[in-house]
Amino acid sequence: MLSIRRFFNNPAIPPEYRRNFIHLYFDIAWFGILSGSAINFLTVYAARLGASGFQIGLLSAMPAVVSLFLSIPAGNWLQKQPVDKAVFWTAVLSRLGYFLWIPLPWLFGNQGQIWALAIITLVMGIPMCALSVGFNALFAASVPIEWRASVVGIRNVVQSLTFIISSLGTGYILNHLRFPTGYQVIFGIGFLSAAMSTFHLFFVRPNLEPVKTISHEMITDQNSSSKFNKVRFNWRGKLRLDIWGTSYRKVMLVFLGFHTAQYLALPVFTIYTVNILHLTDANIGTGTALFYLTVLLGSTQFSRIEHHVGHHKLTGWGVISMSIYPIAMALSHNAIHYYLLSIAGGFAWALVAGAYANYLLERIPEDDRPSHLAWYNIILNAAVLFGSLAGPFLAGYLGLSLGLIIFGALRLLAGVAILKWG
């Protein structure tokens, strides 16, 4: 018990940082329960309602549609707000949507529920856009760079543990309660977990003073008195197109390739496991638990590997390793195969999940994080939107197995691109 306490409350951590770290660990613990229950089984629920590949992809694409339009305004808004308060209130607003999933079986038929879920996720995406940009900025401001690898590693361990427990528990509940009552219970557990995660985010405070800089909107061209030129400059300043003139451009482009390859396959996984492999909810819960068990084991070694390899190379090789999962799924025929590929996929994701956020933060100026993260958020959500809608379409045209193999090859190429040009 003492060793566990020391793992999460390392006495070497300076007192001014310890409180933030503990709340970040509890935040991700509750988020792991949310992810392993409501979020993990949302598309499975939609598939069991009879959702098409397009509708399953749409559930992932809806928040991306919002983020494409709101990421830059969200980044500009966050520049003017206390980042801790902005993260808390956007978390509150976005996570209220999980509660609305619970009564849907009482209100609509199967198709009505599918479209209602799509609309709710669309509305949730509005505050979630600012939350996704703001949390990365809050993490960077509350965790010093020398502690980030350690904190990320522990957060991955905690998330893996809670995800494993909630995935197994969710599969058990769904196998013992009638449809759709079991899913309503799971959505209720997800909402409670989201509320507790948000509660702990409230206590995370920035410790690092941001560097004071002149706002891009305040700078004017003193060699020109043209009002048109000033307006045009302010317009470009608001969009922060200047970021595309920096070395960060290469990072955004390689991540566009990675996330596109990643999200092309994700909706197809649900279709393949439910309609081709005919897995039960317990099978799916066990598979995801095995996936995160290997994420957990990989995370315990993350700090040591990162110290020798670095975030950049670790991200690239992790993405290359992620190509195994879709290719192996295309060759699977039963639950045992699904369990084995889940184990392999978990090790690959442990590398990427631990490294890529820190890799991004290393490439971003400390005094301009929100705007750079907003552009990354646009890249991410463009990939989510395209991949989530194009993946089921291409897999339906090519065949699910061939589509998964091609998507795996694209992941491999994306990893090579990160290593070579990132």
Predicted segments with their positions:
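Helix-loop junctions on the cytosolic side of multi-pass membrane transporters
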Residues: 198-217, 419-422
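Transmembrane alpha-helix termini and helix-breaking/packing motifs in multi-pass membrane transporters
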Residues: 44-48, 102-108, 163-187, 386-404
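Intracellular juxtamembrane helix-capping segments at the cytosolic ends
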Residues: 128-143, 351-364
